[in-house]
Amino acid sequence: MKCCDNIDARMVDETSINLDPIQVGGRLTPEAMKAMISWGDGYSVCDNCRKPFRLDYIEKPPLKDFHVDVAEWLGMAQARTVPGARRGFQQVAGTYVEKGDPVLIGALAHYTSYLSVELQKGIVREIPKTADNHITAEDTANRIEDVVREFGIAPKLLYIDHVDYQFGNMHDVKGIAKVAHQYDIPVLYNGVYTVGIMPVNGKDLGVDFIIGSGHKSMAAPAPSGILAATEERANEVFRTTQMEGDLTGRKFGIKEVGILGCSLMGAPIVGLLASFPTVKARVEHFDEELANSKIVVEALRFIEGTKILSEYPRKHTLTRVDTTGSFDQVAQTHKKRGFFLSSALGKKGITGIIPGATKVWKFNTYGMTKKQAEYVADTYLEIAETNGLTIN
């Protein structure tokens, strides 16, 4: 089936249970799909843009209210939309980091955190992970002292993931922020796997910035994201232009420097807006998501030789698993080699696991029903048993 002459229709979630770690939280709501059709044209949301000519002042569609509501929902003073979380990192780093400045980043952080510092010619120093793959307040304090000794100043910024992308482990953001603020270091909370998935309140956590991903965790089209700030930091990170043309004398009103005036137009922002009521509601049911995740995790644990590498009991639906001692043993002699697992899952209508991966891999159960979770769990057990693995 084709969307048009040379593009196939994508029907992954319509035909399969999707376990892809980066896709499940970004699946669009029906409301977002309809809104995209109506507002998908490039500058459609600018139909009613009037003075002061800024995205977060537009009332039809209600973008002005949306920006206010998102900030309140996150326990922050102000919020802006950005074209993906990485642009939020870039905006914050661009505000505080200059050439040669040290910045602390948790050792499990996404590469875009590092690149946002590199773009400013800053210097990254990592907070080490513990033996059980956590970033702690104690290690943060030690690394801050290391930086002070090395550079003569405290880090200009600290990045911390609430839930990291490698293990899906939850880290002590509140404790880390408390330590950082003793040195007056602003704290950037990376919520790409939490904002839109589970309750997040920046005031309770004590962070200066919250960054969320619309297309990863807020049921929105790509690229989309949220950058929220405290009242103290908002005037810095959302600073307005002071530029004036030397020949023309041109000025540019209250356009914001960090996002080059306006950030999201058309499909990404209306999709984000349209899904927001559903997203606000669904975070209150994260306990149900964890219960469904547990069904799959426990089934995998029953397969002899399988290890859950993420913290256990699980606190998030993203899980890293090591099947070197189970499914990879099958792959050594199977005619399809490592591809036997994804092939067997595919025949059962389950997708999202990297084809060929039978050693260490990740999955995310977010958005599943209990019935689907039970089906996935039973399927893994069936594949294991069919291929001669022991079920405990």
From Swiss-Prot:
Q: Which domain of life is it from?
A: Archaea
Q: Which cofactors are named for this entry?
A: pyridoxal 5'-phosphate
| An annotated GO BP | translation
According to its UniProt record, the EC number is: 2.5.1.73
Q: Which UniProt keywords apply?
A: Protein biosynthesis, Pyridoxal phosphate, Transferase
Under the heading CDD domains, the entry gives: SepCysS
The record, for InterPro entries, names: Aminotrans_V_dom (IPR000192), PyrdxlP-dep_Trfase (IPR015424), PyrdxlP-dep_Trfase_major (IPR015421), PyrdxlP-dep_Trfase_small (IPR015422), Sep_Cys-tRNA_synth_arc (IPR013375)
Gene Ontology MF, one: Sep-tRNA:Cys-tRNA synthase activity
Name the reaction it catalyses: O-phospho-L-seryl-tRNA(Cys) + hydrogen sulfide + H(+) = L-cysteinyl-tRNA(Cys) + phosphate
Q: What top-level class of enzyme does the UniProt entry assign?
A: transferase
User: According to the UniProt entry, which residues carry N6-(pyridoxal phosphate)lysine?
Assistant: K216
Assembly behavior: Homodimer. Interacts with SepRS.
Q: What does this protein do?
A: Converts O-phospho-L-seryl-tRNA(Cys) (Sep-tRNA(Cys)) to L-cysteinyl-tRNA(Cys) (Cys-tRNA(Cys)).
| Protein name per Swiss-Prot or TrEMBL | O-phospho-L-seryl-tRNA:Cys-tRNA synthase 1
Classification from the root reads:
Archaea, Methanobacteriati, Methanobacteriota, Stenosarchaea group, Methanomicrobia
